[in-house]
Each structure stands twice: as structure tokens, then as C-alpha cells.
Design a protein with these regions (language model features):
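Short coil-to-beta-strand transition motifs
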Residues: 19-21, 141-149
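Short, conserved beta-turn/loop elements at beta-strand boundaries and strand-helix junctions
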Residues: 143-145, 155-160
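Acidic-enriched and Gly/Ser
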Residues: 1-137, 163-194
Length: 194
């Protein structure tokens, strides 16, 4: 899998940030997140649809590498220019429904909106964060985990992962996100060999 914002989506993101937007979450069958996101992005020029993906560390036969995988299976974040009706956004190939709380139209607010804003800022991809050791403790210095430090509940220094707990739609989401060790050398940050 290789999800990333195209130049068209990057421009659309700038337009939405300038003009204002509403955010929603769609729910579909796991495995359809990429197909539906691509279809909606191609069919609606006022919309950004993105799954939430993460980079993960893997190792095979002593070789370390990173892979991209879906973090929230079945969920798609959708951002529409203010004033657009989410109910007019349709898929011709796949089923999805708009998640909503009781008595609302699905438009995100509060902590759910903050989370969706963070997903948009990350462009749907949680890259590998960077960390240093300070007195034997892990300190995140760059990347998506930097903004989630209050949500980190566990570190695996050996596997270079942090377990986070966040809440979306009142449900606790538990996930492991990767980091790489870096050295602080005379003020410059340099990547260590993997």
C-alpha cells in the first residue's frame, strides 16, 4: 500500500484550510478504505477523503524495513468545503455510511474534530516519529507522536514503538506507532543506522 496526498489533494487541502471546511467520518467494510477514498477524491473536487494509515517497522531475515498499513480499518475521514452537503457525496461502487451521534448530521465537533484536524494535518499518513534517549527515557522530538505525547501509554524501546490511546466517537482506540532513534550531536539531529 502506498497512500499519499497527490499534488491535486495538497492544493485542495490548502483551499479547504483557507475557505473553511466541515469534517466527517465514514464507516465502510475493512479493506475498502483506499478504493472509496480514491473514488470520492476523483469524483468531488470540493472533497478530501482519506483513510488513516501508519508506517510500521518490520524485520525479515535480519533486514529492517517500514511498511504502510491502515490504522483505523473501516473508517474514512472526509473534509468538505463549508456549505457542502455530505449526503450528496456518494460512491458508485461501495457502501458506506456517515457516522453521527444522536441528533446530528455527522459533522464533527469537539475532540472528534480536533482528531480529524490532526489527521488532515498528517495527510492521512502517520510517518515514523523521531526520538532521543534522555536519562534512559524516550523523548519524542519530531513526527506525529510529538503531538500525541499525552496519549502515549507505553514504549517498546527494543521494537521502537509507542502505544497510544485516543478517543474517537466515544470509543477508545489503541494503536502502536513507530519511532526511530536519533542522536543529538552538537545541536544537529542525525539518524542512527537502523
Amino acid at each position: 500500500m502506498n497512500w499519499s496526498f497527490s499534488s491535486k489533494l495538497l492544493q485542495r487541502k490548502q483551499d479547504l484550510l483557507t475557505s473553511g471546511y466541515d469534517a466527517y467520518v465514514l464507516f465502510t467494510l475493512q479493506g475498502l478504505e483506499l478504493d472509496i477514498s480514491e473514488e470520492l477524491n476523483n469524483n468531488y473536487d470540493y472533497c478530501i477523503a482519506t483513510p488513516l494509515t501508519k508506517m510500521s517497522h518490520r524485520s525479515r531475515s535480519g533486514n529492517k524495513y517500514d511498511v504502510q498499513e491502515i490504522l483505523l480499518g473501516g473508517y474514512i475521514f472526509v473534509y468538505l468545503r463549508k456549505g457542502r452537503d455530505i449526503n450528496k457525496v456518494k460512491s458508485t461502487k461501495n457502501y458506506f455510511r456517515i457516522l453521527s451521534r444522536q441528533n446530528d448530521d455527522g459533522r464533527l465537533c469537539g475532540k472528534d474534530l480536533e482528531y480529524a484536524d490532526w489527521v488532515l494535518e498528517q495527510e492521512g499518513v502517520l510517518s515514523v516519529s523521531e526520538a532521543i534517549k534522555i536519562n534512559g527515557m524516550v523523548k519524542i522530538v519530531n513526527g506525529p507522536l510529538k503531538n500525541l505525547e499525552g496519549s502515549i501509554v507505553e514504549y517498546s524501546k527494543r521494537n521502537r514503538n509507542c502505544r497510544i490511546e485516543v478517543e474517537l466517537f466515544g470509543q477508545k482506540i489503541d494503536a502502536w506507532l513507530p519511532f526511530d532513534w536519533i542522536d543529538a550531536d552538537m545541536g544537529d539531529l542525525k539518524m542512527q543506522q537502523r
